[in-house]
């Protein structure tokens, strides 16, 4: 299965759907779904996902190279892994999504969207994770969902972690730093993301990794992702990652800006970078007689987007943690 990406983009079913690699077994589970199981018993399970948004291609190319290294035997596998290319149709078309944003649909939220390829795919991915985690006895469960951002950022690489009732494990946060993340953002409320679903329903240590700028296939400079790629290689092979990195800055979400109607106005332009700071009292958005202002001494914006559909998030406001 050394042509997983090509098969996914073409929508082709492989002639052979299971086989042996270098020290592991593989099974093709459906378009964009590949399970890898080491020959030796392991108690660690990992979801590696990319392409939930079809225009975010660099992480997909990165996973393709990791798979090639595994198949060639140059990389040893020490985890049970489910590789997920999230939205094959959008990836093939080179667009963010075909109908609706899948990363708002998980945890059953797809039921509140008009039926589409994305709602069906979200349901399929939920079932795939349920099957994957229930078929093993993993003591450790991780989910790394790889993305690139639409706009520029004061932190080139950062992670967004779902709301979690239990403390985050230190080795997981340390690995995120070793993977080159400059900042970590901690959600305080549930959401419809893929990582929130895996964390809430399966207890996985989950993170959405934002790794740079969204570009089409073939236009990515993968050397910009070398730190993350090396950390993933070390993780898969069970090698300790470097500790010679600056710990990521930490932020928590303090509020969400939501667009409810066509009267909505967001006072940030297309050049506003992620993690831009705003002082207390700054007017961020208006909608009719409702005004959204900064309530803390300093807040930082994440994912500002004035053109989202009504009812969706137009931005997150963050507070820096000590």
Curated annotation (Swiss-Prot):
<keyword id="KW-0378">Hydrolase</keyword>
<dbReference type="GO" id="GO:0019545">
    <property type="term" value="P:arginine catabolic process to succinate"/>
</dbReference>
<protein>
    <recommendedName>
        <fullName>Succinylglutamate desuccinylase</fullName>
        <ecNumber>3.5.1.96</ecNumber>
    </recommendedName>
</protein>
<dbReference type="Pfam" id="PF24827">
    <property type="entry name" value="AstE_AspA_cat"/>
</dbReference>
<feature type="binding site">
    <location>
        <position position="53"/>
    </location>
    <ligand>
        <name>Zn(2+)</name>
    </ligand>
</feature>
<comment type="pathway">
    <text>Amino-acid degradation; L-arginine degradation via AST pathway; L-glutamate and succinate from L-arginine: step 5/5.</text>
</comment>
<feature type="binding site">
    <location>
        <position position="56"/>
    </location>
    <ligand>
        <name>Zn(2+)</name>
    </ligand>
</feature>
<feature type="active site">
    <location>
        <position position="210"/>
    </location>
</feature>
<dbReference type="InterPro" id="IPR050178">
    <property type="entry name" value="AspA/AstE_fam"/>
</dbReference>
<keyword id="KW-0862">Zinc</keyword>
<dbReference type="InterPro" id="IPR016681">
    <property type="entry name" value="SuccinylGlu_desuccinylase"/>
</dbReference>
<dbReference type="Pfam" id="PF04952">
    <property type="entry name" value="AstE_AspA_hybrid"/>
</dbReference>
<feature type="binding site">
    <location>
        <position position="147"/>
    </location>
    <ligand>
        <name>Zn(2+)</name>
    </ligand>
</feature>
<dbReference type="InterPro" id="IPR055438">
    <property type="entry name" value="AstE_AspA_cat"/>
</dbReference>
<comment type="similarity">
    <text>Belongs to the AspA/AstE family. Succinylglutamate desuccinylase subfamily.</text>
</comment>
<dbReference type="GO" id="GO:0019544">
    <property type="term" value="P:arginine catabolic process to glutamate"/>
</dbReference>
<dbReference type="GO" id="GO:0016788">
    <property type="term" value="F:hydrolase activity, acting on ester bonds"/>
</dbReference>
<comment type="function">
    <text>Transforms N(2)-succinylglutamate into succinate and glutamate.</text>
</comment>
<keyword id="KW-0479">Metal-binding</keyword>
<keyword id="KW-0056">Arginine metabolism</keyword>
<dbReference type="InterPro" id="IPR007036">
    <property type="entry name" value="Aste_AspA_hybrid_dom"/>
</dbReference>
<dbReference type="GO" id="GO:0009017">
    <property type="term" value="F:succinylglutamate desuccinylase activity"/>
</dbReference>
<dbReference type="GO" id="GO:0008270">
    <property type="term" value="F:zinc ion binding"/>
</dbReference>
């Amino acid at each position: 299965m050394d042509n997983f990406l090509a098969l996914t983009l073409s929508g082709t079913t492989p002639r052979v759907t299971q086989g042996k690699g270098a020290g592991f077994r593989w099974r093709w589970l459906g378009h964009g779904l590949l399970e890898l199981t080491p020959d030796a018993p392991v108690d660690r399970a990992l979801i590696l996902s990319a392409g939930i948004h079809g225009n975010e291609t660099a992480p997909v190319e990165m996973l393709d190279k990791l798979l090639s290294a595994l198949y060639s035997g140059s990389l040893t596998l020490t985890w049970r892994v489910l590789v997920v290319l999230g939205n094959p149709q959008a990836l093939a078309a080179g667009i963010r999504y075909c109908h609706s944003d899948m990363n708002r649909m998980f945890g059953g939220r797809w039921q509140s969207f008009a039926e589409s390829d994305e709602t069906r795919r979200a349901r399929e991915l939920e079932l795939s994770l349920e099957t994957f985690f229930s078929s093993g006895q993993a003591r450790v469960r991780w989910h790394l969902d790889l993305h690139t951002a639409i706009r520029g950022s004061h932190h080139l690489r950062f992670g967004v972690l779902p709301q979690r009732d239990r403390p985050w494990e230190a080795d997981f946060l340390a690995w995120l730093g070793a993977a080159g993340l400059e900042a970590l953002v901690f959600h305080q409320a549930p959401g419809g993301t893929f990582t929130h679903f895996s964390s809430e329903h399966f207890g996985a240590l989950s993170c959405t990794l934002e790794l740079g700028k969204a570009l089409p296939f073939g236009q990515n400079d993968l050397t910009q992702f070398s730190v993350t790629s090396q950390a993933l290689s070390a993780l898969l092979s069970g090698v300790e990652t470097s500790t010679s990195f600056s710990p990521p800055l930490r932020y928590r979400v303090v509020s969400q800006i939501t667009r409810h109607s066509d009267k909505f106005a967001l006072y940030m332009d297309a050049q506003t970078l992620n993690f831009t700071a705003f002082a207390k009292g700054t007017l961020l958005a208006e909608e009719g007689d409702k005004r959204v202002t900064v309530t803390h001494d300093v807040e930082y914006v994440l994912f500002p987007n004035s053109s989202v559909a009504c009812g969706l998030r137009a931005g997150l406001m963050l507070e820096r943690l000590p």
